[in-house]
Each structure stands twice: as C-alpha cells, then as structure tokens.
C-alpha cells in the first residue's frame, strides 16, 4: 500500500512540474547549461584559471622556430627541447628520475658520468674519473701509473747513552 502511495505522489509531482514548465515557456531550459556555468567554463578554457594559456603549438611551428628539427617537439601544446628538457627527455612526457639530467636525449647522472661531468657535454680527460661532478676529484695521481704515497713519518732517535757504547779497543787486545 505504501509503495502505491509513493508511486502516485511521484507521478503527480512529475505531471505538475511538466505543466508548470510548459505554461511558463521553459521547456528548452531543462537540458541547457546555466549562464553562470557557461561563463566559468569559458573562463577556464581561455585563461587556464588565472594563468595565461600557453600559445597553441603546431608541430611544424616548433620545428621552424627552434634550434633544429631533431631537438624541438610539440608536447602538451608547448614547444620543448627534447634533447635537454628533463621532463621530456628524447620523447614527450619521458621524465628523468630525480637528480638525473637530460643530455642529448638520455637521462644521465652528471655527478658520475665522465662524458657529462658536472654538466652536459663536459667530458673528462681519458681515464679520469668523474666524482661529485668533478673530473679527477680525489684521483690518486696526476701521472698515470704512479701512485701517490704519503711519506712515512720517522721519529728522530734519541742520542745513544754513554753506557751503551761498546769499547772495541778492549776486544782488539786479545
């Protein structure tokens, strides 16, 4: 009995609501967006919520305006240098891990890489290690093949005591 009453109330409400909208001439507004929402949607697409929207990027514009065609790509409507940008290293959206740099499209550790020591393109001399971003830092020696040795510290010996001298003259008499 209760479900019949609820169904009847819902049907009456629906019919009255439809009649009201038809009489007032609001038939079309049931499926439209409010003017407030329209203005906020328009503001969001044009100003990016207060920040200026980046210029539209077409792939051929990036290639013409950048240093070379191989370097510039259109990623998320921005022209980026994919050979040096750590957020777009070689490909759009390929990010380098923390503390790695993008050098010629590869994610490298400039603290240990001898080809990119300290910065991209800084190559260490042959055989010199790259440590802490410096070529040859704490290297054993500047000359290959020779090891740097610390001089051994020798304490000065005390002078011999007069009692400890041997008398060799006494032994010669025999």
Curated annotation (Swiss-Prot):
Q: Which domain of life does the protein's organism represent?
A: Eukaryota
Keyword flag Protein biosynthesis: no
Using the UniProt record, give the first listed, main subcellular location: secreted
- Cysteine pairs forming cystine bridges in this chain are none
Task: Output a single Gene Ontology CC term carried by this record.
Answer: extracellular region
Q: Where in the cell is it found?
A: Secreted
UniProt region (Disordered), positions on chain:
140-174
State the deletion phenotype. Answer: Increased embryonic cuticule permeability. Altered cotyledon development. Cup-shaped cotyledons.
What keywords tag this UniProt record?
Answer: Developmental protein, Secreted, Signal
Residues making up the signal peptide according to the UniProt record = 1-25
Biological process annotations from GO: cuticle development; embryo development ending in seed dormancy; seed development
InterPro entries in the record: Stig-like
Family as reported in the entry's similarity comment: Belongs to the STIG1 family.
For this protein, the record's PANTHER family field holds: STIGMA-SPECIFIC STIG1-LIKE PROTEIN 3, STIGMA-SPECIFIC STIG1-LIKE PROTEIN 4
Function field:
Endosperm-specific cysteine-rich protein that acts downstream of BHLH95/ZOU to modify the interface between embryo and endosperm and mediate the separation of these two tissues during seed development. Necessary for the biogenesis of the embryo sheath, an extracuticular endosperm-derived structure at the surface of the embryo. Required for the separation of embryo and endosperm, and for normal progression of the embryo through the endosperm tissue. Required for the formation of a normal embryonic cuticle.
Give the protein's recorded name: Stigma-specific STIG1-like protein 4
From which source organism is this entry?
Arabidopsis thaliana (Mouse-ear cress)
* Organism lineage string: Eukaryota, Viridiplantae, Streptophyta, Embryophyta, Tracheophyta
């Amino acid at each position: 009995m209760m479900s019949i009453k609820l169904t009847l109330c819902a049907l009456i409400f629906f019919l009255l609501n439809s009649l009201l909208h038809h009489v007032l001439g609001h038939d079309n507004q049931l499926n439209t967006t409010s003017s407030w929402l329209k203005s906020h949607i328009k503001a969001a697409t044009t100003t990016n919520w207060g920040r200026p929207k980046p210029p539209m990027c077409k792939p051929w514009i990036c290639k013409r305006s950048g240093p070379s065609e191989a370097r510039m790509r259109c990623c998320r409507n921005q022209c980026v240098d994919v050979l040096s940008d750590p957020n777009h290293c070689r490909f759009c959206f390929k990010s380098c891990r923390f503390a790695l740099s993008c050098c010629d499209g590869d994610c490298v550790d400039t603290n240990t890489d001898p080809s990119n020591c300290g910065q991209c393109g800084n190559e260490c001399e042959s055989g010199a290690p790259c440590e802490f971003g410096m070529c040859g830092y704490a290297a054993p020696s500047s000359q290959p093949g020779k090891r740097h040795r610390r001089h051994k510290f020798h304490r000065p010996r005390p002078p011999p005591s007069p009692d400890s001298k041997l008398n060799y003259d006494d032994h010669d008499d025999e």
